[in-house]
């Protein structure tokens, strides 16, 4: 996993902090991070390296797991967390609703890490076969956009299917018991369904969506504590490089 620091954002952040004089202020006591069941933040949490680095600045780390990007963005918006990672779609809705966010880093596109799945014995063979069927998804997430694009590619309208909005765990349960006909989801839920349930992939994001991931901070927190954010992003990048060099160790996390 290769993390790209959005240098213009960080440069603007530091410049703003200098102009406001906040770099001389006391550091935050706690950095509250929102994460999901995938990606570099999971590895960072497991390794514990961030806690050691920030302890030198007198800052503790608090981790909160979220079921999906929209829920994490709500946490950022209401101020229950200071930093998190999500796909490209949820921040669009959050910022449209007035969320004051700063993009500080990104991961490379991963179009195969989300997919539209059906049960292994389903008679559904293509996206076009979904007409009139029930599809489970996490509303407002990256997979919501994948579903729209996949339907469009197959010549279907969004209104041609029945959407069932469920968080990942509930969607998996509905998928297993046959309460829905298809499920559009991301890794690691996607991989688990493929391996444990032998779910079939109708369409992943290749060629129709990028599935980008962005690291975001609330702008007020980032402006008041730029050194904390810089340290965090540096640790994210370091863990990303470590994961590339140690794939066997990553599977043990």
Model regions and ranges:
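Short, glycine-/small- and polar/acidic-enriched structural segments
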Residues: 29-157, 162-165, 181-185, 202, ...
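A broadly conserved amphipathic alpha-helix scaffold signal in soluble, globular proteins
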Residues: 14, 148-152, 191
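Hydrophobic helical h-region of N-terminal Sec-dependent signal peptides
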Residues: 10-22
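Bacterial N-terminal signal peptides that target proteins for export
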Residues: 1-13
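Pocket-lining segment of extracytoplasmic ligand-binding domains
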Residues: 89, 160-164, 169-253
């Amino acid at each position: 996993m290769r993390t790209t620091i959005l240098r213009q954002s960080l440069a603007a952040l530091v410049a703003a902090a200098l102009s406001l004089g906040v770099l001389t202020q006391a550091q935050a006591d706690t950095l509250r991070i929102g994460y999901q069941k995938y990606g570099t933040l999971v590895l960072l949490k497991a390794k514990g390296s961030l806690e050691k680095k920030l302890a030198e600045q007198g800052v503790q780390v608090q981790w909160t797991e979220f079921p999906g990007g929209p829920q994490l963005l709500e946490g950022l918006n209401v101020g229950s967390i200071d930093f998190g990672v999500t796909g490209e779609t949820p921040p669009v809705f959050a910022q449209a609703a007035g969320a004051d966010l700063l993009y500080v880093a990104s991961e490379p596109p991963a179009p195969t890490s989300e997919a539209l799945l059906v049960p292994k014995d389903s008679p559904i063979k293509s996206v076009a076969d979904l007409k009139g069927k029930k599809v489970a998804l996490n509303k407002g997430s990256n997979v919501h956009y994948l579903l729209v694009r996949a339907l469009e590619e197959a010549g279907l309208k969004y209104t041609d299917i029945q959407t069932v909005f469920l968080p990942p765990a509930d969607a998996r349960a509905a998928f297993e018991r046959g309460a829905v006909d298809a499920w559009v989801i991301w890794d690691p839920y996607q991989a688990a369904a493929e391996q444990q349930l032998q779910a079939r992939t109708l369409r992943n994001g290749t060629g129709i969506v990028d599935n980008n991931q962005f690291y975001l901070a609330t702008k007020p927190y980032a402006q008041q504590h730029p050194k904390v954010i810089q340290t965090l992003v540096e640790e994210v990048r370091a863990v990303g490089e470590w994961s590339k060099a140690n794939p066997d160790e990553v599977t043990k996390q």
